[in-house]
A protein has these predicted regions:
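Short, well-formed alpha-helical segments that are part of the catalytic scaffolds
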Residues: 18-32, 55
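Conserved donor NDP-sugar-binding/catalytic core segment of glycosyltransferases
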Residues: 104-134
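Glycine-rich, basic loop-to-helix element that forms the pyrophosphate-binding segment
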Residues: 71-88
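Cell-envelope/extracellular polymer assembly enzymes that use nucleotide-activated donors
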Residues: 8-10, 40, 181
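Short beta-strand/loop segment that forms part of the nucleotide-sugar
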Residues: 37-48, 68-70
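The conserved acidic donor/metal-binding loop of glycosyltransferases
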Residues: 97-101
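A conserved acidic beta->alpha catalytic loop
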Residues: 28, 45-54, 74
Length: 209
């Protein structure tokens, strides 16, 4: 996509023991078809006891990108996000789960859609990764037919906003659904669904859903 003025983009990836996923997440992210923007990636490692951090640092960083790894001894996604927001330099903030893989077009579409002088929210078009268990497959089949998944900008797995949008609240509260909390700070007219796809794995098993 062309015609977008240069932007500063921060991609915040909270990660707690995500060694099995972080390499795939970053590899897909770095393959984004985007140029002409300053992009920093902040891996927000919180309470990790595996080699998430080492694996994140091993993925080759493309020219024009910057990787920063912020390590917290304590676990907790929301506290990590608050710390990441303070460290981020972007005028576009993208919040990406460590087990999600974006397709190449999505970041460029986000940069084009989010006008810097407005409070706006955007997300891509989700593709739920095929589940392993029969129960999760059935749940996923119903989930993807929900109206907010099919036609809205749901934001689970990845969501983005302008700085003006992020200024609508302070620290992230101690809640479960950060994407829902963020989305509800924007009116339907301020939420943008983009055609760029991303792949999101649903948690497995009845007890985790």
């Amino acid at each position: 996509m062309t015609g977008s003025p240069p932007r500063r983009i921060s991609v915040l990836i909270p990660a707690h023991n995500e060694a099995d996923y972080i390499t795939g997440c970053l590899t897909a992210l770095y393959a984004s078809a985007i140029s002409g923007h300053g992009i920093e990636v902040l891996v927000l490692a919180n309470g990790c006891t595996d080699d998430t951090v080492a694996r994140a640092r091993c993925v080759p960083v493309p020219d024009g990108w910057e990787l920063r790894v912020l390590e917290r001894a304590e676990g907790g996604k929301l506290a990590a996000l608050t710390e990441g927001d303070k460290a981020a330099n972007g005028d576009i903030l993208i919040y990406l789960d460590a087990d999600v893989q974006v397709e190449p077009e999505l970041l460029s579409q986000i940069a084009h859609a989010l006008c810097p002088d407005r409070a706006l929210y955007a997300s891509g078009s989700p593709c739920v990764t095929p589940a392993q268990s029969a129960f999760t497959r059935a749940y996923a089949s119903a989930w993807v037919r929900l109206p907010f998944v099919r036609t809205g900008a749901p934001g689970f797995g990845i969501f983005a906003m302008t700085r003006a949008g992020r200024e609508r609240w302070g620290q992230w509260p101690a809640i479960i659904s950060d994407d829902t909390y963020a989305r509800l700070h924007f009116s339907p007219e301020e939420r943008i669904r983009l055609p760029g796809r991303y792949h999101w794995p649903m948690v497995e098993g009845f007890s985790n859903l």
